[in-house]
Regions:
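Subtilisin-like serine protease catalytic core
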Residues: 171-212, 216-268, 282-285, 311-312, ...
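Surface-exposed binding patches on compact interaction domains or structured appendages
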Residues: 612-613, 640-641, 664-722, 727, ...
Length: 1010
């Protein structure tokens, strides 16, 4: 066993007050237990009824009753129960309780400050584009179909946002698939159903058709969103506002709103379970939730189990992976960790210099020519109206092929008003009566660099504006962002500015120079096919090495709806998940199925693995890769399973069968190969804590039983896949390797099946930090407050006060779980035990006091109820003798990180440890460990310390501490503080008598310092 010292045992002052600096800098954990609250799963509802009745008879309350075909249980609030044993004691009284868990508080971790928040601005929400030079060929449609959005798109009334273009959602919209008739539940902070993009009403016939409020605020029948998170999710999922050009992934789907968090985005695990189960009960066909318990990373927590069971019942469930990328590997959010749950990580787009598409025509008969450009200002002004192009440079005598590289540069400091009058006085359109308005309704084409002669680029822009132009299209050899003043020298606004490449500008100018008219317009946004992992994201896999995330989708700076009717853009995995849920709705229309396993397999196998720094990004960050909605909806080759998990070295399967099915009408030949992703060390060099992963070049050896197969129409073949750990890596650092089995079909299909494995042994890895430094202790002797009720252990006023003893509300300590643990115990271990048959000496200790007790005084000289613990209350587990565990322990499936503990002396309901010497011993079961095997436990111990209670100590009356009722509390006002000090000075005037030769104030300060 590992038995290093613990971190510091710290004194909690008698008031329990938090220093101001600590309060200002403290960050509340995203999840913690709700005191005395538990979730119980019952074999039958009758068992739950009996337990609920017993709880209420004891003065407890029923929090929730869960009656579902996937989960039968209750959550209860138990009064006056201080330990996990109390809950277990209650549970043991009833047969038919399958499992129980403490309720955790949920504190939603915000994604980001809004990238852009506006009533009107649509940051890229008004775009539709086909990939340049390519048109999707739609196979025969099956299942449901709705064509309203398809008609709208073809009539150019609304365009698709960039996240739809990247994932090919727009192609499904073009085919008329919009989620019509599909019910999608949003389990979140509620929905602002008054938002114009979300229907403006609540109830039958509305976009938001039903819902319920499970939070601790508001009307239980009204799921209105007072926080805003759920409204963003709902807009990405199914919003539609033609006037603002906003469209969600499944704009004709209906929403079911289940509010489980309050206005501060806080809630509890049982509230969330209630929302999930109600969504299923109400007939949701897809469930999306973008909130949960950060970093839990276990599939066995109750919320993850409920989500997994809903999936197993046939309802796809989609959850964001989390936003704690800085925490490194193995930090997925519960319930995304549930088996079969679709876990989504967030991508951003790979930015390009020119992201918008236009077209121009020459003469009256030629086909339009596509070109790309970037609007630097006035995106909404670059509409689809076809406008004539005018070459302003030609007006100044510059031809499209002139060599202007030697042109004189104009100084940066320019008086724009004088340049118009002097340098460009003879410019076209300039006459004694002012500038002619010959460019009204035109696009002014102007070369930006190299500098043009006679009149600078910016002068020519102002010349064009003065002549009535509202659209400026600059061109140059290396087009970059062009900045133009918002107004010209005469105060006229510059409404729309864009820039394009020299090949485009020169072609237009040449045509105009030859006397042919040119017309141009913007027609949408360029489809950007590649992305990068967003900063607001997380790492998998789970502690069982289940592949999470399932998929990646755009979640960084995506168009969103805000509560109150606004629009803008925002970031986080919360905003990648609803896009995937909407895609599931579209896929269900195309394929006429909601089978979660099939939908997951399709999105994973058709996804596009992404690259960073010339390496494929680990599967632990991108799952199958970047979502491709159209390809997933129309794929004719199916794979099962959708992902291959090879576990760690000690638990490696010999091989995994990969079944490939050809559902096409003709036979297809497939070529199989390995695509290896970046291998990451779980631990940095010299560390035992998971990090963001040091990348190494070594990859696993993947063996395929067949590399070329031909499968007939409607037939299947199984290929065996085996894996060997990368060579030359340190197994103690747990190298996490991954990649994809590539399946290229002769029909043009290109599928990839993700795989993942771990070198080394998770079971053997350190769970507890064996090198925790012990901070200096303020004391090894503690005088605890008397128990509020029940027993008063030890004799009263039998021990004289010790100047070394610390008076404390509780003993506080902490330990560090560097990995998660399936089971953690925290035992109270007495160092002095005696037989219950031994004689009891009830005499006082006298001057010996607590110090003597701490040194292990002879038990014959001490009161046995104080000096030693009767062995009748001692139990043994895995070689450790204990009187019980700290409140809340043992705990199952604990997340990694710092674990804070407090002990007030209690070890059972209304039972407190006798005065004496103790250690607190924490033990954590290794991942994949056997609880019955002592070798699978790791241990840390506190230093030895001694405890007494206030009533044990004989304190002179003048020095007695105030009672609990009269003890000092933090001042609420300055007046209270002033009154306290006035009273204190009146009672202790001797402390402030000035010393000889010193000023009064100095003496008072010196006395206070002493």
């Amino acid at each position: 066993m590992i038995s290093p010292p613990w971190l510091a045992i710290l004194w909690l002052g008698a008031t329990g007050a938090t220093p101001a600096w600590a309060a200002e800098n403290a960050t509340e954990p995203p999840s913690k237990n709700v005191s005395g609250a538990f979730i119980l799963e019952c074999e039958t509802s009758q068992v739950c009824d009996s337990v609920a009745k017993a709880v209420e008879e004891r003065g407890g309350t029923l929090r929730h009753r869960f009656k579902s075909d996937v989960f039968t249980g209750i959550s209860v609030q138990l009064p006056k129960l201080t330990t996990e044993e109390d809950r277990r004691s209650l549970v043991s009284q009833f047969k038919g309780i399958k499992e129980s868990w403490p309720v955790q508080q949920v504190i939603h971790v915000p994604e980001s400050t809004a990238d852009d928040r506006s009533e009107d601005k649509q940051d890229g929400t008004n775009e539709k584009e086909e990939e340049l030079g390519k048109k999707p060929v739609a196979p025969p449609k099956t299942g449901m179909r709705h064509s309203r959005l398809g008609r709208r798109a073809r009539n150019d009334d609304i365009e698709s946002p960039w996240n739809h273009l990247m994932t090919h959602v727009d192609k499904l919209h073009e085919e008329g698939y919009t989620g019509s008739g599909i019910k999608i539940a949003v389990v979140d902070t509620g929905v602002d159903y008054k938002h114009p993009a979300l229907g403006g009403c609540f109830g039958p016939g509305c976009k938001v058709i039903t819902g319920e409020n499970f939070s601790d605020e508001g009307d239980k029948s009204d799921p209105i969103d007072c926080h805003g998170h759920g409204t963003i999710v709902s807009g990405i999922l199914a919003g539609y506002d033609e006037a603002k050009g906003f469209v969600g992934a499944a704009p004709d789907a209906t929403i079911m709103a289940y509010r489980v968090l309050n206005c501060q985005a806080r809630g509890t695990e049982d509230d969330m379970i209630a929302g999930w189960l109600k969504a299923k009960q109400d007939g949701a066909q897809i469930i999306i939730s973008s909130t949960g318990l950060q970093g839990e990373n276990w599939a066995q927590r109750p919320l993850a189990m409920v989500a997994a069971r809903i999936v197993a019942s046939g309802v796809p469930c989609v959850v964001g992976l989390g936003n704690e990328q800085h925490e490194g590997l193995f930090y997925a959010m519960n319930p995304s960790t549930g088996h079969g749950v679709t876990a989504v990580n967030s991508f951003g787009r790979a930015y390009a210099a020119l992201e918008h598409r236009g077209e121009y025509s020459i003469g009256n008969t030629t086909e339009p020519v596509d070109f790309i450009f970037e609007p630097a200002r006035g995106l909404d002004k670059w509409d689809r109206e076809l406008r004539p192009v005018h070459d302003v440079d030609a007006d100044f005598g510059d031809g499209p092929d002139d060599d202007l590289t030697a042109a004189k540069e104009v100084p940066i400091s320019i008086d724009w008003s004088t340049r118009i009058e002097e340098n460009c006085k003879l410019s076209p359109g300039n006459s004694s009566t002012g500038f002619a308005q010959d460019l009204v309704g035109h696009i002014a084409l102007i070369r930006q660099t190299p500098e043009t002669r006679d009149c600078h680029f910016y002068d020519r822009v102002q010349n064009a504006i003065a002549r009535g132009a509202e659209h400026i299209l600059a061109w140059q050899n290396d087009p970059v962002y062009v900045e133009i003043r918002r107004k010209d020298a005469m105060g006229r606004p510059v409404k729309a500015v864009g820039i394009t490449g020299a090949d485009v500008g020169r072609a237009m100018a040449r045509a105009l120079a030859s006397g042919q008219p040119v017309k141009a317009r913007r027609i949408g946004r360029v489809r950007i096919e590649t992305g990068h992992i967003a900063g607001m994201s997380a790492y998998g896999p789970t502690w069982e090495l289940d592949i999470k995330p399932t998929i990646g989708a755009p979640g960084h700076s995506v168009p969103v709806t805000y509560k109150g009717g606004g629009y803008g853009s925002d970031s986080g995995t919360s905003f990648a998940g609803p896009l995937v849920a909407g895609v599931f709705a579209l896929m269900s229309q195309v394929r006429a199925t909601f089978d979660p396993a099939l939908l997951n397999s399709l999105i994973m196998s058709t996804a596009e693995p992404q690259i960073s720094d010339d390496r494929l990004i680990t599967v632990a960050q991108q799952g199958g890769g970047l979502l491709r909605a159209w390809e997933a909806a129309h794929a004719t080759t199916l794979v099962e399973p959708g992902a291959l998990t090879f576990n760690d070295t000690n638990n490696r399967p010999g091989s995994i069968g990969l079944r490939i099915t050809n559902t096409a009408k003709t036979e297809v030949t497939y070529q199989l190969s390995n695509l290896a992703a970046t291998t990451l060390y779980t631990f940095e060099s010299g560390s035992i804590r998971p990090g963001v992963g040091e990348a190494v070049d070594a990859t696993a050896d993947i063996n395929l039983s067949q590399t070329s197969i031909t499968i007939g129409a409607g037939q299947s073949t199984t290929v065996d896949v085996s894996a060997i750990d990368p060579k030359g890596l340190d197994p103690e650092r747990l190298p996490l390797w991954s990649g994809w089995v590539s399946i290229q079909g002769s029909d043009g299909g290109n599928l990839t099946v993700p795989y993942l494995g771990l070198g080394g042994s998770l079971r053997s890895a350190a769970v507890l930090d064996p090198a925790s430094e012990l901070s200096s202790l303020s004391s090894s002797e503690f005088i605890l407050r008397d128990p509020p009720e029940g027993q008063k252990p030890g004799p009263s006023k039998a021990i004289e006060d010790s100047p070394a003893a610390i008076r404390s509300r509780a003993i506080s300590t902490s330990f560090d779980l560097v990995l998660g643990s399936p089971l953690v115990r925290v035992d109270i271990v007495p160092l002095d035990m005696c037989s219950t048959s031994a004689p009891v000496n009830t005499t006082s200790v006298g001057t010996r006091g607590l110090a003597g007790l701490a040194r292990g005084a002879n038990v014959t000289e001490l009161d046995l109820s104080r000096a030693c613990v009767p062995d009748s209350i001692v139990t043994e587990f895995a070689g450790v003798r204990s009187i019980g565990q700290l409140p809340g322990y043992p705990k199952n499936y604990v997340k990694r990180g710092k674990v804070n503990l407090e002990w007030t002396g209690a070890f059972a309901p209304e039972h407190y440890a006798p005065p004496g010497r103790y250690q607190i011993v924490a033990r954590a079961l290794s991942i994949m460990g056997d609880a019955s095997n002592e070798a699978h436990w790791q241990t840390v111990k506190s230093p030895v310390f001694s405890i007494l209670y206030e009533h044990n100590v004989n304190v002179p009356e003048a020095d007695q501490q105030p009672s609990e009722e009269n003890s000092w509390k933090p001042w609420q006002t300055k007046e209270e503080e002033a009154a306290f000090w006035a009273n204190y000075l009146a009672q202790h005037p001797e402390l402030f008598q000035p010393k000889a030769g010193a000023e009064d104030t100095d003496a008072a300060e010196n006395s206070l310092e002493k």
